[in-house]
Structures are given as C-alpha cells and as structure tokens.
A protein has these predicted regions:
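Anaerobic metallocofactor- and corrinoid-dependent redox/one-carbon enzyme cores
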Residues: 2-180
C-alpha cells in the first residue's frame, strides 16, 4: 500500500498483514519532515514490522526517492539535486530496506527539464544506489509537460538494463499508466 508510513503502521498495529512498509524519503531532515516523518518514525516502523509484520526476513522497508523533492519543499540548503539524492541512499541504507527505487522524471520539468536530463538523472541514481549497496531499482517516467516522450523513457530503461539495474517499478512499453 503506497500510503504514509504512519497510516501503514496503524494498519499493522490493528492486525493487518504486511510484509513491507513504504515511504518516500528525502535527502535532508527538513525534506523528510515536509513528507511528515522523521528518522525516528522509520525506526519505529521497522521495529513494528520486525515484531508484527509478516515478512520472513529482516528487510521490511521500501523507500522511493527522486531528484528534486528537496527543492520542491525548499529543503535542499542550496545543495544540488544529485548530492541531495545521494544523501537519500545513505539515509535509506541505515535502515537496511528491502527495496529502494528512484521515480526519475515524475516531478516534472521544473527539476528535470527534458529527456536528456531524465536519462542523466536515472543513470546517476542507479550509479549512486550501486555505490551505497542498496537494492536499487527505477521507475522510468515523465510528465506530459516535459520535453520527453515514451521513446526516451524506453531508451532510459534499456540503458539501465545494460547498467545492471536490479528492477523496474513499472515498465513503459510505449504507455505510462500515470499519463492516462
């Protein structure tokens, strides 16, 4: 369920079966607070899942990231998007998540202007995920008002495949459900 971490925690506390708790994360404390949580919240979520969750292993969290989220909440402290995104992966790694994926291009041309920037960001995110050792995947997407099309997104998916991307969260196949 792609709900806020606290809503998922309440469901687990009430007996709902759950293998993974999801949360979008940012690369700064201020960014995460803008998303409505703190590191302590994630620690509590992990402890709850290890006690009451249905997963068999110790990796019970799923995080989504994406370049630009700190800029949209004015939580970047004049730091570039790539550095802030790298901080996301270091933060994620602390919690030993089962999955981490970037949703590259979702936030729009205000932060990634066109297909070239989306491609660059997707490859940067993949590289940083590999460097930090998180189980890194990608959701390749774009917004309708961005200078990109499905061919660009499929090209990115192909490049990420060649680069050894662990998984894709949704495969474009000439159509993006988020655009319909």
């Amino acid at each position: 369920v792609l709900a806020h971490v606290t809503a998922q925690m309440k469901a687990v506390e009430q007996g709902a079966p759950c293998d993974l708790i999801f949360q979008s994360i940012a690369g700064s404390q201020k960014g995460n607070e803008a998303f409505g949580f703190t590191a302590r919240t994630l620690e509590e979520a992990k402890a709850l899942m290890l006690q009451k969750g249905t997963a068999e292993g110790p990796n019970v969290l799923y995080f989504e990231t994406g370049q630009g989220s700190e800029l949209s909440s004015n939580a970047h402290f004049d730091t570039d998007q790539v550095t802030m995104e790298a901080r996301c992966y270091g933060f994620a790694r602390h919690f030993a998540p089962f999955l981490v994926n970037t949703v590259v291009g979702f936030i729009g041309p205000e932060y990634l202007y066109d297909a070239r920037q989306v491609t660059r960001a997707g490859l940067e995110d993949h590289f940083m995920g590999k460097l930090t050792g998180v189980s890194m995947g990608c959701d390749c997407c774009y917004t309708n008002h961005m200078k990109a099309d499905q061919n660009d997104i499929e090209n990115l998916a192909g490049l990420l495949t060649l680069a050894g991307c662990n998984y894709f969260m949704g495969i474009p196949h000439g159509d993006d459900i988020m655009l319909n």
